[in-house]
Design a protein with these regions (language model features):
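Conserved class I S-adenosyl-L-methionine
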Residues: 71-81
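Short loop/edge segments at beta-strand edges and connector loops
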Residues: 21, 47, 126-128
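Conserved SAM-binding loop of SAM-dependent methyltransferases across substrates and taxa
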Residues: 82-95
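Short, well-ordered secondary-structure micro-motifs
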Residues: 56, 87, 134-137
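N-terminal auxiliary segments of SAM/dcSAM-dependent transferases
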Residues: 1-43
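Class I SAM-dependent methyltransferase Rossmann-like catalytic core
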Residues: 41-53
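Conserved alpha-helix/loop element of class I SAM-dependent methyltransferases that forms part
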Residues: 33-36, 54-71
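S-adenosylmethionine
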Residues: 95-99, 103-154
Length: 154
C-alpha cells in the first residue's frame, strides 16, 4: 500500500529520522488496515498512500526528534482517533507504555484490532477525557500526555 521502502526511507531521512524495514512493514500494515476500515467507519480523510506516509506517519514520528522521551515512559494519547500520533510512535519506540483514549467505541474497536495486527501493546480506553481524568487510576499517572485540541485534564 505505502510507496516502496526506499522512497519512504528517503522521506524519513529528510527529516533526520531512521526507518527500518521492520518499521516500514508495520506502517504498511497500518496504512492498509486504516484504508480498509475507513470504508465502513470514518476515521480519516487522508487515504492516499503518499499522504498517509507524510501526514500521518512522518508527522507523528517527528515528535521523537524534538522531545526526549525516556525509556519505558508511560504515554496517554487523549482523543486518539485512528491512533495518531501515538501508534506510529509506538512502532518506533515499543518500550513506551501506551494508553489510547477515545470517546467513540467504533474507534476503540479499530484501535484494538490495529494494535493486535501490529503487535503494539496498549491499553485502550473507551471514554470521555473529562470523565477518565477524574479516575485515580489515570489522573497524573503518565510521563507524556499526547493530545490534539483538548484542554489539560491529566
Amino acid at each position: 500500500m505505502l510507496p516502496e521502502f526506499e522512497y519512504a526511507k528517503g522521506l524519513f531521512n529528510e527529516y533526520g529520522l531512521e526507518l527500518s524495514e521492520e518499521q516500514y512493514e508495520k506502517l504498511d500494515i497500518y496504512a492498509e488496515f486504516l484504508v480498509e476500515y475507513n470504508e465502513k467507519v470514518n476515521l480519516t480523510a487522508i487515504t492516499e498512500p503518499d499522504e498517509i506516509l507524510k501526514k500521518h506517519f512522518i508527522d507523528s514520528v517527528l515528535m521523537l526528534k524534538f522531545v526526549d522521551i525516556p525509556r519505558d515512559s508511560s504515554m496517554i494519547d487523549v482523543g486518539t482517533g485512528a491512533g495518531f500520533p501515538s501508534v506510529p510512535i509506538a512502532v518506533f519506540r515499543p518500550d513506551i507504555k501506551l494508553t489510547l483514549l477515545d470517546s467513540l467505541n467504533k474507534r476503540t474497536i479499530f484501535l484494538e484490532k490495529l494494535c493486535e495486527k501490529l503487535g503494539v501493546k496498549a491499553e485502550i480506553i473507551h471514554g470521555r477525557a473529562e470523565e477518565v481524568s477524574k479516575n485515580e487510576k489515570y489522573r497524573e499517572q503518565f510521563d507524556v500526555v499526547q493530545e490534539r485540541s483538548r484542554i489539560w485534564l491529566f
